Amino acid sequence: MKTRFLVFLTLLLSIYGWSQHQTNLVVKLDDDARELTIEQEITFVNTSDISWDKVYLLDWANAFSNLQTPLAIRLAEDFKNRFEFSSDEDKGFTDISSLNTENYIVSRPKSNPDVVILELLEPIAPQTSRSVNITYKVKIPLDDFTGYGKSSDNEYLLKYWYLHPAPFVNGEWQFYSHKDLNDFYGAPTQMSISVHVPSRLKAISSLKMITQVEQENRNSYLFEGLTSSSARLYFLESTDGFKRYSTNQVDLTTDIDDESVPTEMKVVFIDRIASFLNDHVGKSPSRELFISDKFYKENPVYGLSSLPSFINPFPAGFTYEIKMLKALTRKWVEQGISTHNRDEYWLKQGIIIHTIMKYQEQYYPNLKIGGKLSDFWGIRGFNVSQLRFNDRYAFLYLNTKRLNLDQAPNTPADSLLKYNQQLAIPFKAAIGLAYLNDYLGNNAVENSIKKLYSQSPSNSQNSRDFQKYLNEQTDKEIDWFFDYFITRHERLDWKLRNIEKYKDSVIVTIKNKSVYPIPIPIYALKNDSIVYKEWINGFIGDTSITLSRKAIQNKKLGAANRIVVNYEEIIPEFNPRDNYKTLKPFPAFNRPLEFRLFKDIEDPEKSQVFLMPDITFNIYDGLAIGSRFYNGNLLSKPFRYSIKPAYGTNSGKLVGSIGLSYEHPFQDRNNSLFSMRYGLSANQFSYAPDLLYRRGSAWLSFNYRPKDLRSNKRQSLNFRNVFVQRDRNDESLEEDPDYNVFALSFNQSDRNLRRSFSYSFGTEISERFSKASFRLDWRRLYKDNRQLNFRVFMGTFLYNDTRSNDDFFSFALDRPTDYLFDYNYYGRSEDDGLFSQQLILAEGGFKAQLDPAFANQWITTLNSSYSIWKYIFVYGDVGAVKNKGTSARFVYDTGIRLNLLQDYFELYFPVYNNNGWEIAQPNYDEKIRFIVTLDVNTFIGLFTRRWY
């Protein structure tokens, strides 16, 4: 009996002393084949109480194997086309040669081709271990796709290159595919890697180097360490760029550098950051840390390097320190807290940003985002220049909140919009932690973070564990934070509805405009100084509180003269502009009017009107130089107005526009109706020499978007009424230059990298005509980087009482008359000259000027183009045009298209059409058509599409 007990005790101690998986790898690089040959022994340790009949391995190197993997699909969704157009030789894959053995069978989940299943013929019993040997080859991809792989310098940066055990948590295996989100989640594994590379290369790793042997033909290395993330392995021609810094807390190896910062100062910064992290997060589980510049650039400090290198408005070494702060904090948290990095994305990211904010508060409390530039004349007047460094987090988060694109912090990382994944959700989570800490007091959040961190990284943690630790720190109720703030996306908003003033007290009524109850602070101010602050528990609808006059006065500052909700903007509120009420007697203003030059961030204490220089162009008015008065700032807002008076330098006339609009967002993601917009607009410009047009429009638009915000599917239903009044042209035969048109249209689109599809149909009704039209656009990108485009347009008049010789309202084959003044023509009335060659791809969409040019009965056209080399396309158009009293006319058109920047800068060269060989006819230069877009907002959309 005693012997059995000793055997059992020995086995139990060995299991608990060796609770992580272990793996030994022998890795050989074939430089010519861009291939790793790997012999791997994995010892699986089953510390659960469930037998394992199969185990899962993460094989993210195989994510590069074809265009159907989750990674390939993700890259295409983000409009990253390099992988899409790469050859098979440039991609990567894993080739497991030991497919079947006596001990296990290898397979892969259908939807996860970068995960390997080892089906064990004999299960691994609880509290036992089993060793498995696997031999395989890994084809290394080029680094063009994710930044990792073989570079053009013939060096190798390897991140996901071997088989790593997946974690087994709460009775189930947790695994997911590579999607370039830097969210690898593996089981803690003790690793030993023997690496052999050609002698021209040196190896360095995120694991500790144990031995190094350099020989004539090859260099050999041994790396060891414990990790739950993928072990990074770099093969470089020189590792001299990596420096080692030893401090009291850590020994750091890094190639993050700044030549302007002395080594001694770098050591001071690293030691200060490490000491701060040790005090506020916890002691690092490993003294040896490896942080590469590549690691930092995966999640950098956005905007820090926007200024030229010769302009440094920050304190000496600040840029280096903040880079190191971001990278070191991320490394510290990732290696010390084990969570499901995709489903619990907000938790780690929130802790990382929250810790960075605390550091900046301690060492740079008054530093502004512009540094010294914020004090320069001409810059210091802008509100944005006065933002403190920590204020940018709330500002950047509110960007998506104002666009109605906010998502709940607990949304899985792969379901987030790119902007939310990179910026908004980490920032919102961090702000939420700061908000919670202010409400609870006594450093409850920081203490809970340290408790979370103190648990062994071998123990997987989640939000429920964090909530438990918080409850241990306070008697206050905090369920609202996890039930509402973390799990909901709806906006937070309050309004200071009313103040009743009495001799000894003030009764304040606050309206909660959001859908859930969370605490809110209320303040009494003397000018801009806080006299009194009180937290109000969460409520729905309205609530009233009584503040005694005695409480809201201060011996030094005197009596308060303003009451404000959320004055310090602790909570990222949707609209703080209605949070202010004055205690001053009438006629004081709650928010005085302020005029500001150029666009800026809003000041919630004032009603702001922004003034911007504005320049437009058409050949009749010339440069229309004027000013734009509007209430729009750097963040979107529901109600907008814009007044743009201008003077035409050619016409010598007053021109311009005015617009009012309101957007009502719908926050219920289960309802596809995303927003409703309505408004009024009017403008006046020249449409011909010495002739003005005046257009007024009222419009209503319903916009639809799927629940999955990452989807590019869009729908809209639009109603508008357009009234046009034109100066009469004595040379024209028109009887009445004024008209009114009601238009109804429905649009649907799904624009993606591989395939773009959209269609619309609509109708227009006027006193003299009614018409219906249909348009379809389709584009396909092929593996060889060839592009095929189709466009179909069909239009018919339901009735047409216009004169037969007047084609102003007719369908156009190549150049729409634009009687609704929707298009940005630079010379809309030109019949010859350069500006008559401007092409607007609408209606018939032809490029050549053919006869008949218009259709007063019906028209059907098909436009197509196909790329033959890079930006050179061939195009072809065919169609039929029907006019009253004549038979339908078949038309066709072919030529060459230079697609320099699609929809923004294109040239069309007609070759052959109904007129014959255009290229052989005189005045060919007059037949070339061009597309040039000068709308900056449209151009910016080309670059922001992957973020929203």
Question: How does the language model describe each region?
Answer:
Residues 343, 349-431:
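Acidic/His/Gly-enriched intrinsically disordered linker/tail segments
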Residues 518-520, 528-530, 536-537, 547-555, ...:
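Outer-membrane beta-barrel initiation region
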Residues 193, 218, 222, 242-347, ...:
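Juxtacatalytic substrate-recognition/specificity segment
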Residues 898, 902-903, 925-948:
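Outer-membrane beta-barrel "beta-signal"
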Residues 204-205, 289, 478-479, 492-567:
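Beta-strand-rich binding/interaction modules
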Residues 411-503, 508:
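Amphipathic alpha-helical substructures
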Residues 79-98, 108-110, 132-232:
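Extended, low-hydrophobicity, Ser/Thr/Pro/Gly-biased non-transmembrane segments
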Residues 677-688, 699, 742-867:
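C-terminal outer-membrane beta-barrel translocator/porin domains of Gram-negative envelope proteins
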